[in-house]
Regions:
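Catalytic loop of the DD-peptidase/beta-lactamase superfamily, centered on the K-T-G motif
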Residues: 2-4, 29-84, 270-387
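N-terminal low-complexity, Pro/Thr-rich disordered segments
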Residues: 9-58, 167, 171-175, 247-260, ...
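A generic alpha-helix surface/boundary motif
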Residues: 54, 113-114, 129, 210, ...
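Residue-level preference for non-acidic, small/hydrophobic
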Residues: 60, 78, 109-112, 116, ...
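N-terminal carbohydrate-binding/catalytic regions of secreted carbohydrate-active enzymes
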Residues: 72-95, 103, 110
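Short active-site loop at a secondary-structure junction
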Residues: 92-150, 196-205, 278
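Short, surface-exposed loop or secondary-structure junction motifs
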Residues: 142-336, 340, 344
Length: 387
């Protein structure tokens, strides 16, 4: 089983490394990290449908391990299967919750793209109009050729990464309760000038979708969060999906504790202000809701069918693997479109064939959730696309 991807795509779009040989050390400030006995995996009986349920069950049977504390998987399309394994809290050893809420990371971009494409269908936004038409004060004179809305959607805008609170999980952890606004992120980006001409090459990054969030607010006169709710979450019945609410560091409702390796110690990183990720990665969701999102996007419910072809077109540029929000893979000769998301302690994947004959969504709690994690995708997602 193979997946066509690039080293860059693996490093940026797939972000948790399976490291089962690692040993958990005591939680910072606690006496023990291991549950007394790992709960048995829970899985639904597979319905007929051409995927490797045995491999998925085997993957869950190995959870928890030295890196992964919990895993939730849903497979849909022609045949369905779901399973959960691991623990929701290393202190108590309580079993994982099949419907737990989690930080969905960059899968947020799929929602942002859907909202923008609805505005395009309403003729309130034009794909090939410069972003400065909607945000006239955004770009300084150094941008002699402003990127278009299409460039932002396809990660080809030439915008440089914006401000951040650190480049490693350990650096960011020290600032986890601080607030960095989207406006500050974007201001730091545009102050550097463009990295390249718009449309010259594709470089995945959050900055493109942070600007799109600002565009949505400028065009609608409404908050990004409310537009996402009324245009995507509510129509699709995503009742357990939303945004934390500004700098709120908590995940409200049932959820798993998240862990990362900070200074050589397994540390609880569940509470974390992620508001700087905003329209690029601040969403909280469940696997069932993300499955609804997949069916809603590919089924034409929240992305107009006339624009879905454009969403699923990879631009002919250097490094191109993404359409709008979603990345294209080929697995055993099948074209798959998907998106990963990672925040400290949380790694998420959603993927589907264009005809929805196969879908997969998973959420994994992993200490290495922000590292190159193609092995996790191989373990928890690729068996769903086995021929």
């Amino acid at each position: 089983m193979t997946a066509r991807t690039t080293a860059r795509a693996r490093a940026t779009a797939v972000s948790a490394l399976l490291a089962s040989s690692l040993l958990l050390v005591p939680l910072a400030g606690t006496a023990a990290a291991h549950p007394a006995a790992a709960p048995s995996p829970a899985a639904s009986a597979p319905r007929a449908g051409g995927f490797d349920a045995t491999a998925l069950e085997r993957a869950l049977a190995e959870v928890p391990d030295g890196d992964v504390s919990a895993a939730l998987i849903r497979v849909g399309g022609k045949g369905s299967w779901s399973g959960s394994a691991g623990v929701r809290d290393l202190r108590t050893g309580a079993p994982a919750l099949p419907h737990a809420r989690f930080r969905a990371g960059s899968t947020t971009k799929v929602v942002t793209a859907a909202v923008v494409l609805q505005l395009v269908a309403e003729k309130r936004v034009a794909l090939d109009a410069p972003v400065s038409h909607y945000l006239p004060d955004l770009l300084p004179p150094s941008f002699t050729e402003p990127p278009t809305v299409r460039h932002l959607l396809t990660y080809t805008s030439g915008l440089r990464p914006g401000a951040s609170l650190g480049s490693t999980t350990e650096e960011m952890y020290a600032h986890r309760f601080e607030t960095l606004t989207p406006q500050e992120v974007v201001a730091a980006s545009v102050a550097q000038g463009p990295a390249h001409d718009p449309g010259e090459r594709q470089e995945y990054g959050n900055i493109h979708y942070t600007v799109l969030g600002m565009l949505i607010e400028a065009v609608t006169g409404d908050s990004y969060e409310h537009q996402a709710a009324v245009r995507v979450f509510r129509p699709l019945g995503m009742r357990h999906t939303g945004f934390p609410g500004g700098p709120d560091p908590r995940i409200h409702g049932p959820h798993h504790r998240a862990y990362a390796d900070i200074g050589g110690r397994t540390t609880d990183v569940t509470e974390w202000n992620m508001s700087d990720r905003w329209a690029a990665g601040d969403m909280i969701s469940t696997t069932a809701d993300l499955e609804r999102l997949v069916f809603g996007v590919f089924g034409g419910k929240v992305v107009p069918r006339a624009l879905l072809d454009q969403m699923l077109t990879v631009p002919d540029v250097d490094g191109g693997t993404y359409g709008m929000a979603l990345e294209r893979f080929v697995i055993d000769g099948r074209e798959i479109w998907g998106k990963t998301g990672s925040r400290p302690g949380y790694h998420t994947v959603l993927g589907a064939t264009r005809d929805l004959s196969r879908t997969v969504v998973y959420s994994v709690n992993a200490k290495s959730a922000r590292e190159d994690g193609f092995p996790l995708v191989q373990r928890f997602a690729l068996p769903a696309f086995a021929s």
